Swiss-Prot record:
Its EC number is 6.3.2.4. This is D-alanine--D-alanine ligase. Belongs to the D-alanine--D-alanine ligase family. NCBIfam families: D_ala_D_alaTIGR, PRK01372.1. Cell wall formation. Pathway: Cell wall biogenesis; peptidoglycan biosynthesis. It comes from Granulibacter bethesdensis (strain ATCC BAA-1260 / CGDNIH1). GO terms for molecular function: ATP binding; D-alanine-D-alanine ligase activity; metal ion binding. Keywords: ATP-binding, Cell shape, Cell wall biogenesis/degradation, Cytoplasm, Ligase, Magnesium, Manganese, Metal-binding, Nucleotide-binding, Peptidoglycan synthesis. It comes from the Bacteria. SUPFAM superfamilies: Glutathione synthetase ATP-binding domain-like, PreATP-grasp domain.
């Protein structure tokens, strides 16, 4: 199949809309530089408008959406129904990866290292600590560190967090893993490298991820070689455990305060890695010899094998 016409979907209706707008603009420019005929479609709340904009059908849809509707299997199902090839993972992998509790179950079944944790109701959270402190509270279905809180000893925000919770009736709570934030990009069957993320603040939050100068990225990460290889292996195994396709990015905590090689814990798999100027996957691809235009072209070419 000769690919000429590519639609880039960006924007969306999630908490991560602003990130998606930046990703989409970067992708549109890169694909035009690569020689494709590119049509950007800013996705809003009315699905009928999006479907109408996809008529006539393009050769490929580049999905640059993040969060709800963009990476939870919803838009993937629409594109499958329209029989249009699209980038990144399909319905099932996207839905499971976005549901952090379901992803945990899949990781455990595959024998991958995860933090101790469980789903709790907001009422349970309001009443008492669900785990020994310190622990992390996170939405079950959000990305980009949206809604994430860390509670240490002496922190009295738990009841306030529960009362103001706006991410459904449940939250995922997990033990807090001290140490370093790591990430590994995967392109199909290839784990790229390990990035050590050094946020300017104490926590790798939304601002640290996307603000200019919010974090420092060290790649390849300087760490015990056994742990480095383990991170690559686990990222690839997690990609396959969820049935992902194309590009993903696996996030880890690495507790190097323990005896070597330290404790590596898988946090999540991102099926729609960010493609902003400060994003991690493009940096890793560049280190491996693939510039941003080539990365976007690769993603489009990977979409040709399915519809």
């Amino acid at each position: 199949m000769s690919i000429r016409r590519v639609v880039v979907l960006y924007g969306g209706i999630s908490e991560e809309r602003a990130v998606s707008l930046i990703s989409g603009q970067q992708v549109v420019a890169a694909l035009r530089e690569a020689g494709y005929e590119v049509t950007p479609i800013e996705v809003g709340a009315d699905l009928r408008d999006t479907i109408a904009a996809l008529t006539p059908a393009p050769d490929v849809v580049f999905n640059a959406l993040h969060g709800r509707f963009g990476e939870d299997g919803a838009i993937q199902g629409v594109l499958d129904w329209l029989n249009i090839p699209y980038t990144h993972s399909g319905v099932r992998a996207s839905a499971i990866a976005m549901d952090k509790a379901a992803a945990r179950t899949a990781f455990l079944a595959a024998g991958l290292p995860v933090a101790e944790g469980r789903l709790v109701t907001v009422e349970e959270l309001a009443e008492q600590d669900p785990l020994p402190r310190p622990f992390v509270i996170k939405p079950a279905n959000e990305g980009s560190a949206v809604g994430v809180h860390i509670l240490h000893e002496g922190d009295n925000r738990r009841t306030e967090i529960a009362r103001s919770w706006s991410f459904g009736g449940q939250a995922l709570v997990e033990e807090y893993i001290p140490g370093r934030e790591l990430t590994v990009g995967v392109l199909n069957d290839r784990a790229l490298t390990v990035t050590d993320i050094r946020p300017r603040s104490a926590f790798y939050d939304y601002e640290s991820k996307y603000a200019e100068g919010g974090s420092r990225h060290i790649l390849p990460a300087q760490m015990h070689p056994d742990a480095f290889k383990r991170a690559l292996d686990v990222a690839l195994a997690a990609h396959h455990a969820l049935g992902c396709r194309g590009a993903t990015r696996s996030d880890f905590r690495y507790d190097d305060t323990r005896a070597e090689p330290g404790r590596l814990v898988l946090l999540e798999v991102n099926t729609q890695p960010g493609l902003t100027p400060t994003s991690l996957l493009p940096e890793q691809a560049a280190l491996m010899g693939m510039d941003f235009v080539s990365l976007c072209r690769w993603m489009v070419e990977q979409a040709t094998c399915r519809a």
